Amino acid sequence: RAIILVAGRGSRLPKKLSLNPKSFLKIGDQTIIEKLIKNFHQSGINKIALVTGYKRYKFKKFCLKTFHNEKWKKTNMVFSLNKANSWLKRYKCIVSYGDIFYEKKALKNLLVNKGSISVSYDPFWKKLWKKRFKKVLDDAETFRIKNKNILEIGKKTNKINDIQGQYMGLIKFEPRGWKKFKACLKNDFDNKFSNLYL
């Protein structure tokens, strides 16, 4: 199964473009959300759910299962993800940001990975960041791994050695992994995810 997080508005977009959810941006002849759904279908994943928020009615045309984050203005992606708890605690789920592109190989690698939580990342992130920003550390976050385990992720840094890659916005949870995730972050869950991001 797949869960696509589309609750956010896309606050960094120009006002004209933010009239629609961010995932409705068109690249070529398809919107981002259309491309994501197509990628999942082509990979054999037909049970797809959307976690909606901003302008939820726009997504009705896709005729997909939806979970709604009514507090989308004040909460973050982890809060949105927990809205799909009924799926995550029972099924293996690929979770995707609703505004990303990735090679099908990244999705395939996640599907065959045996870990209870599997995170996709780009080890060649610097090439893209150099195109996007004047300084390569602008908007980059820590990503440190050892023995296939993540030691640190998602913090600001001024040290290039703290960044072994960048999280791609694509992650797989097995039910046992989701259970561990919730247990580790119990305090954040209890505090409405005030300081936690995915």
Where are these regions (language model features)?
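Conserved core of the sugar-phosphate nucleotidyltransferase
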Residues: 62, 104-184
